Amino acid sequence: MTLLTETLSNIRPVDAGLMAQAQARLDNKTKPIGSLGRLEEFARRTVAISGSLDPSTAKKAIFTFAADHGVVEEGVSAFPKEVTVQMVFNFLKGGAGINVLANHVGADVLVVDMGIDHDFGDTPGLIDRKVARGTRNMAKGPAMTREEAVTALEAGIELACGCKADGVAMAGTGEMGIGNTTAASAIIAAFSGKTVADVTHRGTGINDAALAKKVTIIEQALAVNRPDPKDPIDVLAKVGGLEIAGIAGLVLGCAANRIPVVVDGFISTAGALIACELCPTVKEYIFAAHESVEIGHRFMLERIGAEPILDLHLRLGEGTGAALAMGLIEAGVKILKEMATFAEAGVEKGRDQ
């Protein structure tokens, strides 16, 4: 049995009984029933996912997966692919947006090389899971082989298993890869059947002419590769990315290990979508951090049945939205654990409570 097959077989529905118990506890806190809105949802879902009425949120980790994309040679991005490796060094030095926001919520940032076209050698702090030096140009053929896609998926699963061993209570996804909005748009187009134009946006800020070219290139990639929407690994291999595969694997591994996973924006949700297509139960373990301004993101969220926590017009990636959402999820859990009950506070209940 492969690691992927074993992981899929270990994913079970969350504990609905514990979720109900958590809500009963929340209803007995010193507040009108339901008055803390989605914070209560975050608390009861964390309980159901973790399998504990006293879930920890002490240790949080955000995985920023990085890889290059061969399709960049078609001119689909405003930035050259060299920016991928440059930003990885920025992450490692602590100077990026994700570093600032992760520090803000007390989360660790773990940077993973899934497929960057650069020889890092023994770079301190970088997790080496390189499958290839980037994908191939999907406009001309498959982005990767099926074997490469599975290897990248299993690398993400292994990282999730490491989270379990290290006592990580909440994981987050992030990414870096010039050209990866092209891959994400291709993935949602393949699964949804929507036109490429309906799911493709400006990514790093391309102009109208470049956007039109990006749409054409994605249409070409789909026509050349004909990814099978009934086979998620086929979609991933033909029009995906190595960092997207790593994210998908992390999400699967978190579900198998009962770890809440906070999924960032458009590219991260492409990975989560692959995971959910492989095993629909996975969606029970996902918190959607935010809704990106990338127009294809809404269709992804709808397909996995996830309601985003935030809408801040974010489009950076890296895991920035996941970091912010983690703070709110943790706040909900603290309400469950730290807020007084009516009896403890000596406060009378309302007539309907």
From Swiss-Prot:
Q: Which GO terms describe its molecular function?
A: nicotinate-nucleotide-dimethylbenzimidazole phosphoribosyltransferase activity
SUPFAM superfamilies, per the entry = Nicotinate mononucleotide:5,6-dimethylbenzimidazole phosphoribosyltransferase (CobT) (SSF52733)
Catalytic activity from the UniProt record? 5,6-dimethylbenzimidazole + nicotinate beta-D-ribonucleotide = alpha-ribazole 5'-phosphate + nicotinate + H(+)
InterPro entries found in the cross-reference section = Nict_dMeBzImd_PRibTrfase (IPR003200), Nict_dMeBzImd_PRibTrfase_bact (IPR017846), Nict_dMeBzImd_PRibTrfase_N (IPR023195), Nict_dMeBzImd_PRibTrfase_sf (IPR036087)
The protein's UniProt keywords, in alphabetical order, are: Cobalamin biosynthesis, Glycosyltransferase, Transferase
CDD domains in the record: DMB-PRT_CobT
What single Pfam family name could you report for this chain, choosing any that match?
Answer: DBI_PRT
Catalytic center residues? E318
Q: Which GO terms describe its biological process?
A: cobalamin biosynthetic process
Which superkingdom? Bacteria
Q: What class of enzyme is it?
A: transferase
The EC number(s) given in the record are 2.4.2.21
Q: In which pathway does it act?
A: Nucleoside biosynthesis; alpha-ribazole biosynthesis; alpha-ribazole from 5,6-dimethylbenzimidazole: step 1/2
Q: List the Gene3D superfamilies hit by this protein, alphabetically.
A: 1.10.1610.10, 3.40.50.10210
Q: What does this protein do?
A: Catalyzes the synthesis of alpha-ribazole-5'-phosphate from nicotinate mononucleotide (NAMN) and 5,6-dimethylbenzimidazole (DMB).
Indicate the family of this protein.
Belongs to the CobT family.
Identify this protein by name.
Nicotinate-nucleotide--dimethylbenzimidazole phosphoribosyltransferase
This protein's species is Geobacter metallireducens (strain ATCC 53774 / DSM 7210 / GS-15)
What gene does this protein come from? Answer: cobT
